Design a protein with these regions (language model features):
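Long, charge-dense low-complexity segments
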Residues: 1-118, 147, 151, 156-159, ...
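A short, solvent-exposed beta-edge/loop patch
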Residues: 111-152
């Protein structure tokens, strides 16, 4: 199938069943793209093996749907949500203005990325922090974020400045 990624297409959240948003599965490699009934040739098998070695180790954060601990040069939590981008940044700005845009002690918001129409806030963790270590703080962030998403008042000056800082650290992945 030939696909030109520059052509307009549906957004990911338009084709996913958002009622099943929390029903995600982490895969060990990219073999899920292939039909299990078909034989994979040797060069494809080698490529899959090589890619398996390069996949960023990722674990779900216990008790927080959409939050994933990732091990890179440092450890991070990526928090995947299906919230509207404007509302999400407003809510994060409210938390940031209060010093609450983190997933626990020693963590900090480092930015976010947009992919397939979704915004994914990213938090850097203190050295050696595991997924279970950050679960309580990530659960607290999820509750605070849910509450902040219900606020409809305009942002105050401090929150607007915080929002500008948050948005300036957002990148789009295509």
């Amino acid at each position: 199938i030939s696909i030109d990624v520059r052509e307009p297409s549906e957004r990911l959240q338009d084709i996913l069943d958002l009622a099943r948003f929390t029903d995600m599965k982490l895969e060990e490699d990219f073999s899920f793209w292939f039909d299990p009934a078909e034989e994979i040739d040797e060069s494809t098998r080698r490529a899959l093996d090589q890619n398996r070695e390069e996949i960023i180790p990722t674990e779900p954060v216990p008790g927080v749907p959409g939050a994933y601990w990732c091990e890179m040069n440092r450890n991070f939590v990526r928090f995947l949500t299906d919230n509207d981008e404007t509302k999400l940044f407003d809510a994060l700005a409210r938390l940031a203005a209060r010093g609450e845009a983190n997933v626990g002690e020693g963590s900090r918001y480092v930015g976010s990325f947009r992919a397939c129409g979704l915004v994914v806030p990213v938090f850097e963790l203190s050295e050696g922090a595991s997924a279970s270590d950050v679960a309580p703080g990530t659960q607290a962030l999820a509750r605070a974020l849910a509450e902040a998403l219900t606020v409809t008042e305009r942002l105050n000056d401090k929150e607007r400045r915080a929002r500008q800082g948050l948005v300036s650290r957002a990148v789009t992945i295509r």
